[in-house]
Amino acid sequence: MISLVESARQDIAKGGSQTVEILYSPKPGSSGLESTPEVRPEPGVPLNFTMERVARTGKDKTWGSVLYILARESKAEILLELGACAGVSAAYLSSSEHCKVLHTIEGSAALSELARETLQKITNNAHVHNALFDDALDELLPDLPYVDLAFIDGHHEKVATIHYWERIAPKMRPGGIVIFDDISWSQDMRDGWIHLSQQPQFSHAADLGSIGVCICGGNDSEKPRYWDLQPVLGKKAIGSPHGWSKQAGEVVR
């Protein structure tokens, strides 16, 4: 499985300096300071990433394996991902033998097509939806009986991350896994993770530095049991996203 996914990543990287439009996470505050399920975050800034950069942007082999293990060990059947990028993370998640269907959402039309090409090489149970996250959730959530595993990626802003969680939360099964990506992307995202990791809907929350993993099933009155695994895995420095200094349409290599 790993070799198949990494081979697909190498195929993407072969595109070299060819560019593809992506939506880069906006600066904190672009969507206001308060999160609600109703107020929709602003979309990201369109930038042009080289194919080589896109291949590096997806979760690497180590973190991809972590995603696969979480999907496999939780026996997740219905999976939901926000932020397909080139489809690498979705390929790892949907490779679990328990996965019946994975829905992944991507705002960039070019990345959506790239994700479809990637996933067709790996699995037949992943579906790519090209739309802004909220628009796709409007269509998907009413028809999903439940969600076993949610991977919230793509829009690295505290208010936006909390908003998307609040929309997905009613569909999560007890014992379901929620993975928040890039929790050290910026101080704003770090603050978002700290807030989310204290929510009583979760029974457990684990800080892995790059990602935060929560288990649904709290009693709505107590904070979840919190595990800080950074001393074991290595502390993740708070990022300073380079894309914030770019203008719309600029090329990022």
Predicted feature residues:
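A short alpha-helical cap/connector motif
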Residues: 1-151, 156-179, 183-253
